UniProtKB/Swiss-Prot annotation:
GO terms of molecular function: pyridoxal phosphate binding; threonine deaminase activity
GO CC aspect terms: chloroplast
Entry's pH dependence statement: Active at alkaline pH.
Gene encoding the protein: TD1
The name this protein goes by in its record: Threonine dehydratase 1 biosynthetic, chloroplastic
Catalytic activity: L-threonine = 2-oxobutanoate + NH4(+)
Cofactor(s) the protein needs: pyridoxal 5'-phosphate
Upper classification of the organism: Eukaryota, Viridiplantae, Streptophyta, Embryophyta, Tracheophyta
InterPro entries: ACT-like_dom_sf, Ser/Thr_Dehydratase, Ser/Thr_deHydtase_PyrdxlP-BS, TD_ACT-like, TD_ACT-like_sf, Thr_deHydtase_biosynth, TrpB-like_PALP, TrpB-like_PALP_sf
Entry comment describing in which tissues the protein is expressed: Expressed constitutively in all tissues examined including root, stem, petiole, leaf, immature flower bud, unopened flower and opened flower with the highest expression in opened flower and lowest in leaf.
């Protein structure tokens, strides 16, 4: 049970089970209608007939699933998460098609029915959320996968695949790469099956995560700065040692294990279900649930939920092919995946109804909702489906229906709770962040306070500026209704106090609200947001790239409680040196975004 640290290898050779190789997908254009309807009657009759035939006979399939060999891989289209914009709760619809080859629906259904995941996993409860149900006017049901032995659904897929391995393969051991829940699932499964497990994690993995894996008896190896480097090492070591690589989502046996969640929901809730909301990272959970339910209860909508900045499945369905995100947000780290799986995409393209996108604030609000409902704290990815369900119900005005949200995990990093607390009321629309201009005259502050009226000020920042005729006040107010905010803004404007709503501006919420010190005129300042890896030497690597070549005029570091930290940097770069600056920024390998044109920066800091 040692913890080893190595330099990452560069080889990308993989070692996966010979029974499964990835399969190609068929390109299907996305529909342009807002909400997809019920399945075509022909398809419904076909799959219902299949389901009747299968369910009436004993399930005996225990062999590992097999798939056809893959064709040569085609380079994936690289896209930005921000290239797909929609309102929270809007269903980005998918137009499902009949199967296109590969592992059949019959095989998935029979394997889910005969899965042995209950040797280690629990049949988790389906609990009603009374407070949320009353607030939304629908019956909200929570599928409590956060109550599994490793506090995540991932144990199902890992164990199902490992339990099907021949004895001689188990004796050689297993290996996986993961920075979170999949690692614990593989470690516990190996413990129960009596085999050796090596878990490869990035060196940036928080101590609490790798120590949890170590306690389960696995060997933890810390390699590389990113998941990709850890995965490359794991696959190379699997090949050299003859170990079986256990993928986190893109394998039929893993998908089958996750599909048992859908089987349980269908058994636990006898009333008609309008929709089941499923968090999506690589797609294993939603693919498994859809593979089962669309063959036994095809009228139930299966809806994926993704963060706005980690929307690989939504963009893949939009483009009709798997795509690779050029960068991915790390707040909901359990679903921070740049590319969905080949087999998971094939199933999603065939079966699911669409995807809903939600922002970070909404996820934080749902974490708070869950705490108030059940006194449980979900991780961001674990609250994702609940946020999507709430947004969908509000957008479409859904009333009186049954909706199910899968609370997929509770491995919350404690350090992240500070940020969740700050953003939860914003996500609930119970707090607004505003900026108001007022004259630098005696009595202006009192006039401002009178205009705020009875509203509760939760945050206030002001600094006198002798060089300006107007001061800028940045503040937050508590809300009961949106009408309160509209009324206050109208009062401000009628008193010639220009007021701007910055509630949806992440730059303000992450950085600028902590930097109020007055506006300044810094020549040639470029404002950038970088994501630093949480490891020693990250800052010096950054400074070596830019200093003393250019002057750093602003620096604000904000730990996020995960493997990366948000850093806001101002650097004075003459116009004729911008190309050189961008080249150096690209060479760092840190994700970054330019913020110089951000409205809030222009108002507050410049």
């Amino acid at each position: 049970m040692e913890v080893l640290r190595f330099t990452a290898v560069k080889s990308l050779n993989s070692c996966v089970r010979p029974e499964f190789t990835a399969m190609s997908s068929v390109i299907v254009p996305i529909s342009t209608v807002k909400v997809s309807g019920t399945r075509k009657s022909k398809k419904k009759a076909l799959i219902c007939a299949k389901a009747t035939e299968i369910l009436s006979s004993p399930a005996t399939v225990t062999e590992p699933l097999k798939a056809e060999p893959a064709e040569a891989p085609v380079p994936l289209l690289r896209v930005s998460p921000s290239s797909l914009q929609c309102e929270p709760g809007y269903l980005l619809p998918n137009s499902p098609v009949l199967g296109t080859g590969g592992v059949t629906g019959y095989e998935y259904l029979t394997n889910i029915l005969s899965s042995k995941v209950y040797d280690v996993a629990y049949e988790t409860p389906l609990q009603k959320a009374p407070k949320l149900s009353e607030r939304l006017g629908v019956n909200v049901w929570l599928k409590r996968e956060d109550l599994q032995p490793v506090f995540s659904f991932k144990i199902r897929g890992a164990y199902n695949m490992m339990a099907k391995l021949p004895k001689e393969q188990l004796e050689k051991g297993v290996i996986c790469s993961s920075a979170g829940n999949h690692a614990q699932g593989v470690a516990l499964s190996a413990q129960r099956l009596g085999c050796d497990a090596v878990i490869v994690m990035p060196v940036t993995t928080p101590d609490i995560k790798w120590k949890s894996v170590k306690r389960l008896g696995a060997t933890v190896v810390l390699v590389g700065d990113s998941y990709d480097e850890a995965q490359a090492y794991a696959k190379k070591r699997a090949e050299s040692e003859g170990r079986t690589f256990i993928p986190p989502f893109d394998h039929p046996d893993v998908i089958v294990g996750q599909g048992t969640v859908g089987m349980e929901i269908n058994r636990q809730l006898k009333d008609n279900i309008h929709a089941i909301f499923v968090p999506v990272g690589g797609g294993g959970l939603i693919a498994g649930i859809a593979a089962y339910l669309k063959r036994v209860a095809p009228d139930i909508k299966i809806i994926g939920v993704e963060p706005l900045d980690a929307n690989a499945l939504a963009l893949s369905l939009h483009h009709g092919q798997r795509v690779m995100l050029d960068q991915v947000g790390g707040f909901a780290d359990g679903v921070a995946v740049k590319v969905v799986g080949e087999e998971t995409y094939r199933l999603c393209e065939e079966l699911i109804d669409g995807v809903v996108l939600v922002g970070r604030d909404a996820i934080c609000a749902s974490i708070k909702d869950m705490f108030e409902e059940k006194r449980s704290i979900l991780e961001p990815a674990g609250a994702l489906a609940l946020a999507g369900a709430e947004a969908y119900c509000k957008y479409y005005g859904l009333k009186g229906e049954n909706v199910v949200a899968i609370t997929s995990g509770a491995n919350m990093n404690f350090d992240r709770l500070r940020l969740v607390t700050e953003l939860a009321d914003v996500g609930r629309q119970r707090e607004a962040v505003l900026a108001t201009f007022m004259p630098e005259d005696p009595g202006s502050f009192k006039k401002f306070a009178e205009m705020v009226g009875p509203m509760n000020i939760t945050e206030f920042k002001y600094r006198y500026n002798s060089d300006k005729e107007r001061a800028l006040v940045l503040y937050s107010v508590g809300l009961h209704t949106i009408l309160e905010l509209e009324g206050m803004v109208e009062r401000m404007e009628s008193a010639d106090l220009q007021t701007i709503n910055l509630t949806d501006n992440d730059l303000v919420k992450d950085h600028l609200r902590h930097l109020m010190g007055g506006r300044t005129n810094v020549h040639n300042e470029l404002l950038c947001r970088f994501t630093f890896p949480e490891k020693p030497g990250a800052l010096m690597k950054f400074l070596d790239a830019f200093s003393p070549r250019w002057n750093i005029s602003l620096f604000h570091y904000r730990a996020q409680g995960d493997t990366g930290a948000n850093v806001l940097v101002g650097i004075q770069v003459p116009p004729d040196e911008v190309v050189e600056f961008e080249g150096r920024a690209d060479s760092l390998g840190y994700e970054y975004a330019m913020e110089s044109l951000n409205e809030a920066y222009q108002l507050i800091m410049h």
